[in-house]
From Swiss-Prot:
Keywords: Endoplasmic reticulum, Membrane, Transmembrane, Transmembrane helix. This is Triple QxxK/R motif-containing protein. It is found in: Endoplasmic reticulum membrane. The chain crosses the membrane at residues 51-71. InterPro entries: TRIQK. It comes from the Eukaryota. It is a single-pass membrane protein. Belongs to the TRIQK family.
Length: 84
């Protein structure tokens, strides 16, 4: 008999979940589809942080190439001046 009485009392968490489930059923298919697509786009979109890191890496590479050529050309020019 104790089991019968215990099953009639529901936890507040279970009642809350049941209410949320009812609210979810009230949504129409286009709303649910839009919500799902928005969540997928948020998960799969590249972050601004990733884009900034790529741009910084490219700029550092270009700076390194520029510095390499600048140093090589400046030493060649110095040698030409010394030979005169």
């Amino acid at each position: 008999m104790g089991k019968k009485d215990a099953s009639s009392v529901k936890l507040p968490v279970d009642q809350y979940r049941k209410q949320i489930g009812k609210q979810d059923y009230k949504k129409t298919k286009p709303v649910l589809r839009a919500t799902r697509l928005k969540a997928e786009a948020k998960r799969s979109a590249p972050g601004i942080r990733d884009i900034i890191l790529v741009i910084v890496a490219v700029l550092l590479f270009l700076l390194g190439v520029y510095a390499f050529f600048y140093l090589n050309l400046s030493t060649e020019l110095d040698l030409d001046v010394d030979m005169d």
